[in-house]
């Protein structure tokens, strides 16, 4: 999330009018590096206000919000609230706004078998549903794009730790064709940060589908394996048990193919590099942390362990 764009009083007035609410409190939400988000409190309810920062069309942004409405009955998600014009997105001062239900919950502080099985089930349900959605129906762009970040970093003159090693690693996986694998709409950013738990440590909400796009399912699978399991430095036995459990419970809802299993290691490396390069780009080239009004900084160095000794 994070905040890159100021919210001015005339825009607050516009939001109040468009959604028939009276805002009592607004706070910046610091975590994340792709959109501007605000916590909003009214007398009776709480909301999340998103200001879109991506260079996407209104129709592309609507695709995400329509998807949330379609999956809310079997996946716990926060849906967008339509304005008085029955539209998901409101436009004012050349800014695009969306208002979401606020769902209170607890951040994930510990990864265990129960959590891994739950995210596996929900991800399997999501992919089982979206396998029937074509690229033509969900043709929105994503900013989680290894090729873009690789090219921007390679042509720049910036230097940083592990630069040559990272670029060489990307070169090695560049020739693999993931498009031959089963595809549909994926979450694209399914990190523990985008999940909240209830008081019994069950998943209460999965949010931030704003980078969802049509892609091979193996990318979401690799993100979970990397950023829910491998990043935590479990011992060999625990790590492999968690990965096995994740794949088994996922397969109860969408069976993973042999071809996907064969490509799993290279997919994990690709997704690790994707988010490493995203962070490098945001920090070193785009200067997002300097430009942000309010943001929680995240270093690419925290992710290097995912590609070392592979």
Regions found by a protein language model. Name each.
Residues 218-254, 270-287:
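Active-site activation/catalytic loop segments of kinase-like enzymes and analogous catalytic loops
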Residues 110-161, 183:
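A cross-family kinase active-site recognition segment
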Residues 1-77, 81, 198-199:
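Conserved NTP-binding catalytic cores of kinases and kinase-like/nucleotidyltransferase enzymes
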Residues 8-18, 135, 147-188, 198, ...:
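An alpha-helical support segment within catalytic cores of ATP-dependent transferases
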Residues 97-110, 151, 273-287:
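A glycine-centered beta->alpha junction motif in the catalytic cores
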Residues 33-41, 48-49, 80, 173-219:
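Active-site acidic catalytic loop and adjacent metal/ATP-binding pocket
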Residues 42-133:
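ATP-binding pocket architecture of kinase catalytic cores
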Residues 275-310:
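ATP/Mg2+ or Mg2+-diphosphate-binding catalytic cores
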């Amino acid at each position: 999330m994070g905040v890159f764009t100021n919210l001015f009083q005339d825009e607050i007035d516009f939001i109040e009018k468009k959604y028939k609410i009276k805002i009592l409190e607004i706070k910046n939400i610091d975590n994340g590096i792709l959109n501007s988000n605000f916590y909003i409190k009214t007398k009776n309810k709480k909301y999340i206000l998103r200001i879109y920062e991506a260079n996407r069309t209104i129709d592309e942004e609507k695709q995400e919000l329509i998807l949330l409405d379609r999956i809310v009955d079997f996946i716990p998600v926060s849906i967008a609230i339509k304005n008085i014009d029955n539209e998901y997105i409101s436009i004012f001062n050349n800014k695009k706004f969306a208002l979401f239900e606020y769902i209170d919950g607890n951040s994930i502080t510990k990864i265990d078998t129960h959590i891994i099985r739950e995210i596996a089930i929900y991800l399997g349900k999501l992919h089982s549903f979206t396998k029937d959605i074509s690229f033509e129906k969900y043709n929105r762009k994503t900013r989680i794009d290894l090729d873009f970040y690789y090219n921007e970093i390679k042509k720049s003159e910036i230097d940083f730790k592990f630069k040559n090693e990272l670029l060489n690693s990307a070169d090695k996986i560049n020739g693999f064709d993931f498009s031959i694998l089963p595809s549909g709409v994926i979450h694209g950013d399914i990190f523990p940060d985008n999940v909240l738990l209830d008081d019994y440590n069950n998943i209460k909400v999965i949010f931030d589908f704003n980078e969802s796009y049509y892609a091979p399912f193996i990318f979401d699978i690799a993100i979970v394996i990397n950023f829910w399991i491998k990043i935590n430095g479990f011992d060999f036995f625990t790590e492999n048990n968690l990965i096995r459990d994740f794949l088994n419970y996922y397969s109860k809802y969408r069976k993973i193919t042999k071809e996907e299993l064969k490509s799993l290691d290279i997919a994990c490396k690709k997704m690790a590099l994707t988010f490493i390069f995203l962070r490098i780009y945001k920090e070193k080239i785009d200067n997002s942390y300097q430009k942000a009004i309010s943001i929680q900084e995240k270093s690419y160095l925290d992710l290097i362990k995912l590609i070392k000794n592979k």
